[in-house]
Amino acid sequence: MKHLIISEYGIYLGLESGRLVVKNKDDKKYFPLNRLATLSIAKKGVSFSSDLVEQFSLRGIKLFFLDFRGVAHSMLVGANQHAVVQARINQYRYIDRNALTLSIKLIAAKIKNQRATLNYFNKHHKSINLLNAIEELKRVAQLIKNAKTLNDVLGYEGYAANIYFSSLAKDKFLSASFANREGRGSQEIANSMLNFGYAILSSYILNAITNAGLEPYLGFLHQKRPGKMSLVLDLMEEYRAWVVDRVVIKLREQYKNKQYIDTKLKSILISEIQATIAKKYIYNGKKLKLEHIIQRQVYRLSGEFAGEHNYKPYIFKW
């Protein structure tokens, strides 16, 4: 299934002969609706027809609206795409009792995937600095199993992130101006690329959560507060390093001399992340697109909430 992102000003989205038509001043592009899973609007000045919205609703195609950072601020789904009540009841009950256990598993996997990302680049760029970071991350992934509270988990996560990003900064795998990790609102180019990439990843995670009927605002690790999709942030953790960080590192030559992330860079980053998510990886002995792995992982998490499955985070092989 296709996930389409509109990042140009002045685009019109309509319906022609049962297909989505994307129009600008110079040309038209057509996309069959039966191959479309989501459409994200990442630019102001985009218009669309009510006929198209009706077809999206009938077919279960989700329409996301992203802010300038690429973060979804609105989602339009059909009235028939209701939540699965029992799935959410299971989620509420489980998280109330088992938040710590699940958080430990998830952040241990995040650290292992950070380590896999460093190993991936160390294959071709032999570095003592990277090797030291790889060994320290291995140690932290074991230590986190001793965490007694959610604050302990967050402490291990923060320490591992510092080791990971410091090693990338020392060997200049990101921009020359990258010194440490900065969140939303950062003006530093590599951090801006990372932040936009994470926002794109979050729309895939949100889509998978919605398909499973879970509550995106009820997470187990990240703080619960109005407007914050805590479960989306939680489930992103195991994919951040491999899906986004690795892509941003590979694109370094495209942005190393730029001061800010422009429309062209955003388009390149979107395309590369989409290519990564469309790539096939081994999952339970079969080769599946990462998009499908993410969905299966969310269904498996829903199964753990119901007491039917044991959730195992996905670990990437380098």
From Swiss-Prot:
What are the required cofactors?
Mg(2+); Mn(2+)
Q: Does the keyword Phosphoprotein apply?
A: no
The protein's Enzyme Commission number: 3.1.-.-
Task: State the superkingdom.
Answer: Bacteria
Which amino acids does the record list as binding Mn(2+)? E157, H222, E237
List the molecular function annotations (GO) for this entry: DNA binding; DNA endonuclease activity; metal ion binding
Any one of the GO BP annotations = defense response to virus
- Which Gene3D superfamilies is this protein grouped with? CRISPR-associated endonuclease Cas1, C-terminal domain, CRISPR-associated endonuclease Cas1, N-terminal domain
Concerning its family, UniProt says: Belongs to the CRISPR-associated endonuclease Cas1 family.
The identity of this protein, by name, is CRISPR-associated endonuclease Cas1 1
Q: Which organism is it from?
A: Francisella tularensis subsp. novicida (strain U112)
Phylogenetic classification of the source organism: Bacteria, Pseudomonadati, Pseudomonadota, Gammaproteobacteria, Thiotrichales
